[in-house]
């Protein structure tokens, strides 16, 4: 079978998901188009402007005609739907008489005609669908259906089904978003049953009391949970009783889950559920099998388990084949202007971008700023400070979007699959090299191309030395990016002016907390007063704050920074409300000397270097002038 370009047409990701990763030559193009790339470029270049084009109707008809031809081609050829497709077709229809008819009916409704490689191998290579197995497969290759189909089939066929109201299938996954995805797929697969099976979710970030009440009152057959909340459930005897007859335990994204700090929780869960000797089935899905996974596998899977891998032994990992670059920011105050300049440059070639920040509140500030017209692309925002419903909605919208920028924390850094992300930007230090790699893994998925860029200050550049094994090169247009930052300063100043004080204060506080609690101070060659000074520079020169945002003394104490000079301690209602504050000066340009460790403590001439307010109250400190009594420590 001949195939064309390997890059999918993004517009079709919305119109006919899942789009095959190869574009066949035998499908004729609309009139006037000589090749697939030309057609692809015309559509993606003008997609957001279709309403204003005179030929809008003709382009739409072209798209609809291509859809018709693609569907016809899929029906005639041996192309397999889904990622990793080049081995020939394995239609779900071949499972008739083996897989429950209602599940096959649901697959038809879901328009899943062909199995992906991992689905086909699990359904055909397991000695029994009740067998223990370790399956190596990447995210986005159809793993969810690979474990749901055999386990749901066994449950529907009544193989050792527990009493009604007790959980038969327990699925543990590392993030709330993945849990939502799995539960949605489960509901779709059971939608054709006369009485659909109840699938419940137990995740953090949601109202625990109401979720637990629904779980206890309902008749859950399937529970999808994150480790922390599941351990919480199992700690209560009445809740644990509902999990006393599990038939199948599934660990999804096991390497991600165990390498990201959940090892202790998972081990505790394995102690709280019925022992392996009771006969429950174990299924472990993981892209890699590091030592931590092997430790858990020995408990979850019995000796002689089936091992399946859909990953080529010599396949280059994503983080090694994605072009990666770094841009060194002149100073932390230039963070926002440099990011604006970089995005202005990159959106010429990238239309779906994820930008990671170091904390949830910094991400919120990025999103607020760039929503003020700093980019022509639609801005999305997702982080742990948002409600679960807001995060779920954003996840769905960004998946469907053809273009856009999503500012994100690590709630989507691991495991989440967003189609056609062609650029990942990381602003600031990742916690470690592993976190960096997982973020890079959000691009170049399912055979697509992608790039990754990290923005760091000079002090943070040690990250490249510590992680020499990562192929991070200097960005070829670093000089142009830094030069363009100054031209973005006015726009950034205007954007920052429209953002409330509380949003900036939270970002400022979280920035300090990140470094104070991460053990990175020594590596960036900072002491505690230096950290506060750096954060003040970011706030005043970068965020446009008139003075360091107010901090609560209790919060400062919890950060281990009690007595450190440079803080502007809150009084009265300083931490209440979210009022806009006019910035002083321009981001990236020094405006005042309030950045020293003695910030806010003017001398006799009104400067800021001493411990007493000046007579005339110059700067921010004079007792008799506008500064009043000094508030800094």
Curated annotation (Swiss-Prot):
Domain Helicase C-terminal per the UniProt entry, residue ranges: 262-429
Keywords: ATP-binding, Helicase, Hydrolase, Mitochondrion, mRNA processing, mRNA splicing, Nucleotide-binding, RNA-binding, Transit peptide, Translation regulation
Keyword presence, Manganese: no
Ranges for region Disordered: 567-633
Cellular compartments annotated: Mitochondrion matrix
GO BP annotations, alphabetical order: mRNA processing; regulation of translation; RNA splicing
Intervals of motif Q motif: 38-66
Main location: mitochondrion
Sequence motif DEAD box, location on chain: 195-198
Enzyme class: hydrolase
Ranges for domain Helicase ATP-binding: 70-248
Entry-linked InterPro entries: DEAD/DEAH_box_helicase_dom, Helicase_ATP-bd, Helicase_C-like, P-loop_NTPase
GO molecular function: ATP binding; ATP hydrolysis activity; RNA binding; RNA helicase activity
PANTHER family attached to this UniProt entry: RNA HELICASE
Name under which the protein is recorded: ATP-dependent RNA helicase mss116, mitochondrial
Native organism: Aspergillus oryzae (strain ATCC 42149 / RIB 40)
Source taxonomy: Eukaryota, Fungi, Dikarya, Ascomycota, Pezizomycotina
């Amino acid at each position: 079978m001949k195939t064309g370009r390997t890059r999918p047409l993004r517009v079709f990701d919305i119109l006919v998901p899942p789009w095959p990763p190869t574009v066949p030559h035998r499908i004729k193009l609309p009139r006037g188009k000589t090749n697939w790339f030309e057609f692809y470029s015309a559509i993606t270049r003008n997609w957001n402007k279709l309403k204003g084009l005179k030929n809008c109707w003709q382009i739409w008809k072209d798209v609809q005609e291509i859809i018709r031809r693609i569907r016809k081609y899929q029906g005639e050829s041996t192309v397999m739907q889904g990622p990793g497709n080049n081995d020939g077709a394995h239609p779900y229809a071949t499972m008739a008489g083996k897989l429950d008819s209602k599940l096959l009916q649901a697959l038809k409704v879901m328009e899943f005609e062909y199995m992906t490689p991992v689905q086909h191998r699990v359904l055909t290579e397991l000695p029994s669908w009740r067998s223990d197995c370790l399956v190596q497969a990447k995210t986005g290759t159809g793993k969810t259906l690979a474990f749901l189909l055999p386990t749901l089939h066994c449950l529907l066929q009544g193989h050792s089904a527990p009493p009604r109201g007790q959980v038969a299938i327990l699925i543990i996954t590392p993030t709330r978003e993945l849990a939502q995805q799995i539960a949605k797929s489960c509901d779709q697969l059971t939608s054709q049953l006369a009485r659909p099976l109840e699938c419940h979710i137990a995740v953090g970030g949601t109202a625990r009391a109401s979720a637990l009440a629904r779980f206890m009152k309902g008749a859950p057959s399937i529970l999808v949970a994150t480790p922390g909340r599941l351990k919480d459930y199992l700690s209560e005897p009445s809740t644990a009783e509902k999990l006393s007859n599990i038939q199948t335990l599934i660990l999804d994204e096991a390497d991600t889950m165990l390498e990201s700090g959940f090892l202790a929780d998972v081990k505790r869960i394995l102690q709280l559920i019925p022992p392996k000797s009771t006969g429950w089935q174990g299924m472990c899905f993981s892209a890699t099998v590091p030592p931590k996974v092997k430790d858990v596998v020995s408990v979850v899977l019995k000796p002689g388990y089936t091992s399946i891998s859909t990953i080529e032994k010599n396949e280059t990992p994503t983080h090694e084949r994605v072009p990666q670059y770094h841009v060194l920011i002149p100073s932390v105050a230039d963070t926002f202007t440099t990011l604006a300049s970089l995005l202005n440059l990159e959106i010429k070639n990238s239309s779906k971008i994820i930008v990671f920040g170091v904390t949830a509140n910094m991400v919120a500030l990025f999103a607020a700023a760039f929503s003020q017209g700093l980019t022509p692309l639609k801005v999305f925002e997702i982080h742990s400070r948002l409600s679960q419903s807001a995060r779920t909605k954003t996840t769905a919208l960004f998946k469907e979007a053809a273009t856009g920028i999503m500012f994100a924390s690590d709630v989507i850094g691991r495991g989440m699959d967003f189609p056609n992300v062609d650029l990942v930007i990381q602003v600031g230090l990742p916690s470690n090299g592993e976190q960096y790699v997982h973020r890079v893994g959000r691009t170049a998925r399912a055979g697509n191309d992608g790039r990754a860029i990290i923005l760091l200050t000079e002090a943070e550049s040690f990250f490249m030395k510590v992680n020499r094994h990562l192929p991070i090169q200097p960005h070829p247009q670093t000089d142009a990016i830094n030069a363009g930052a100054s031209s973005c300063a006015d726009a950034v100043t205007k954007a920052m002016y429209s953002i409330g004080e509380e949003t900036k204060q939270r970002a400022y506080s979280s920035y300090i907390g990140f470094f104070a609690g991460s053990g990175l101070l020594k590596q960036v060659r900072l002491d505690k007063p230096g950290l506060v000074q750096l954060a003040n520079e970011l706030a005043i020169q970068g965020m446009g704050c008139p003075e360091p945002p107010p901090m609560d003394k209790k919060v400062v104490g919890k950060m281990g920074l009690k007595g450190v000079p440079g803080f502007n301690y809150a009084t009265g209602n300083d931490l209440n409300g979210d009022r806009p504050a006019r910035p002083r000066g321009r981001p990236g340009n020094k405006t005042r000397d309030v950045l020293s460790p003695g910030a806010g403590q003017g001398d006799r001439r009104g400067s800021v270097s001493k411990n007493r307010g000046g007579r005339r109250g110059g700067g921010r400190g004079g007792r008799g002038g506008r500064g009043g009594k000094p508030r800094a420590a």
